[in-house]
Amino acid sequence: MKKTRNVASSPIECVHLQTKPTTTLVRSFFFFLFNSQTISSFIIFYLFLCSFFWFCQSPNLTNPSPPPLSVAPLRGDANSPPPESSSSPATKSSLMISSRDPNALFSGGGISFLAGVRTVKFSYGYSSLKGKRATMEDYFETRISDVNGQMVAFFGVFDGHGGARTAEYLKNNLFKNLVSHDDFISDTKKAIVEVFKQTDEEYLIEEAGQPKNAGSTAATAFLIGDKLIVANVGDSRVVASRNGSAVPLSDDHKPDRSDERQRIEDAGGFIIWAGTWRVGGILAVSRAFGDKQLKPYVIAEPEIQEEDISTLEFIVVASDGLWNVLSNKDAVAIVRDISDAETAARKLVQEGYARGSCDNITCIVVRFEVS
């Protein structure tokens, strides 16, 4: 629209301009500044001006509630694809990255068997949501594979920081490297430690030309026969239910853990408070893959725990986007009342979002039946 101007007939007449309210306020401000005789009047006008600009630039205040979640179809819905055969590797790990709707919540799962001393039937479900973060940095992996004649199930959640590329690398390479290790079946714990270190070293070589530092946590669970082996690096977490009680199967790697702080200082590093305790004032976890500028203080050596599956009802593997707002006890209580693993995983993610999680949220639920 063209601006029109009415020229004043004398110097003392007002000039009327069809201008934006902000222009008028700015002119009024300078007029008032040079003509006001009292400091108190100036302060009142200044506060009014600040309030006006705050109101103009604030988001829509009439609709403070978050947008509704877009939900992928449940397994078995009319429009969903048929389930994959449990005899082939199941990889459901990057749907949330490729979605056209960045706010969509994705979920899925399956059912399978493992033969050990006792037959283990398990069902698993996964769910992932970008949530309130600007970008999605979580990846996850579910695999069921035959390794040297032994069926192995793998579940992993990888929470990236400084970008998603480390988490994506782990999704693509960690399990592949593990099952390639000669002693993976015969000495699983030893193989896990060696492969985690190997994968971290190979990633750092690949990262050599990257100007920006990036890293990722890893919370992993392996089902081999009737054994559950958990290995974690960072603050993604694995929690089990035993007789209805929450049992942590991993311990978060935080810089303020006394043993972690001692290890970092012994290696020549330091931790300082910057909103939370951080390694070198930068990273809020004390172990991670990647983070080349913080080696050797931030390591990818996992802590490992083994359990007999027959003593457990289910496990939850999740990124800290869930654990920041849900306690272990709360998560177990929610899953306990939901028999379907996929529905339980979806419920956990939705509950984390509803409770105000500001991070990406990804979780996997695995239910056990031992006969």
UniProtKB/Swiss-Prot annotation:
Keyword terms, alphabetized: Hydrolase, Magnesium, Manganese, Membrane, Metal-binding, Protein phosphatase, Transmembrane, Transmembrane helix
Biased composition (Low complexity): 85-94
Residues that span the membrane, as ranges: 29-49
Keyword Acetylation annotated: no
Protein name in UniProt: Probable protein phosphatase 2C 11
Binding site for Mn(2+) 1: D159, G160
PANTHER family: PROTEIN PHOSPHATASE
Cofactor: Mg(2+); Mn(2+)
Positions that bind Mn(2+) 2: D159, D320, D359
Similarity section: Belongs to the PP2C family.
Cofactor note: Binds 2 magnesium or manganese ions per subunit.
Tree of life domain: Eukaryota
CDD domains: PP2Cc
Disordered: annotated span: 67-95
GO molecular function, one term: protein serine/threonine phosphatase activity
EC top class, as a word: hydrolase
Major localization listed first in the record, in broad terms: membrane
EC number(s) reported in the record: 3.1.3.16
Cross-referenced Pfam families: PP2C
Originating species: Arabidopsis thaliana
Residue ranges constituting the PPM-type phosphatase domain according to the UniProt record: 123-368
Catalytic activity: O-phospho-L-seryl-[protein] + H2O = L-seryl-[protein] + phosphate; O-phospho-L-threonyl-[protein] + H2O = L-threonyl-[protein] + phosphate
GO cellular component term, pick one: membrane
Subcellular location: Membrane
Membrane topology: Single-pass membrane protein
